[in-house]
Design a protein with these regions (language model features):
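Hydrophobic, aromatic-enriched alpha-helical segments typical of multi-pass transmembrane helices
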Residues: 1-172
Length: 172
């Protein structure tokens, strides 16, 4: 990734670094649906799931913003600095994926238990379950594996939120 990023323009690196936190904010707005879909007696669990997911995606936005360093510092061949950044991001990713994993697992469990207005089949399309399909995207034909596999976490959100909007409209 460093070899690719260090060839990018400064403008693209700055823009890419800023997109992460902005996207995190938008995801937090979207995560509010976790409160809206909960049956009334389980609202507190919806709020907990909302806050866990928000914290995870905020850490993810910060993680994304640090990727600009791969290009900004990488082009100057500061190997020691790059090694520190790689180590730091290696630690930070556990917070991102850990928190998001807990939040997504909670959502899947809530759907299966019938705590939400979502039909139980939505479990199959919940982000935590779709995430496990990531290894299959690497088996797609060349071109598709990059278009779909490279942006799989984005596709997860597109699939889930499209179906969530439909089911919220139909079942509410």
């Amino acid at each position: 990734i460093i070899d690719i990023m260090k060839k990018e323009s400064r403008k693209r690196l700055y823009t890419g670094g800023i997109i992460g936190p902005v996207a995190a904010f938008l995801y937090c707005v979207g995560y509010y649906h976790l409160v809206l879909i909960m049956n009334e007696q389980y609202q507190a669990w919806g709020w907990i799931c909302f806050f866990v997911n928000c914290l995870g995606i905020i850490c993810g936005g910060a993680y994304h913003s640090h990727c600009a360093y791969f290009g900004l510092i990488g082009r100057h061949a500061h190997e020691e600095s790059m090694n520190e950044i790689v180590k730091y991001l290696g630690v930070q990713k556990y917070f991102v994926f850990g928190l998001q994993g807990i939040g997504f697992l909670a959502l899947a469990v809530f759907i299966v238990l019938g705590w939400t207005i979502m039909p139980r089949w939505m479990f199959c399309f919940s982000p935590g379950i779709l995430f496990f399909l990531a290894p299959l995207t690497r088996k797609l034909p060349k071109g598709l594996n990059i278009a779909i596999g490279g942006g799989w976490t984005n596709w997860i959100s597109i699939i889930y939120y499209a179906l969530a909007l439909i089911t919220m409209y139909v079942y509410k």
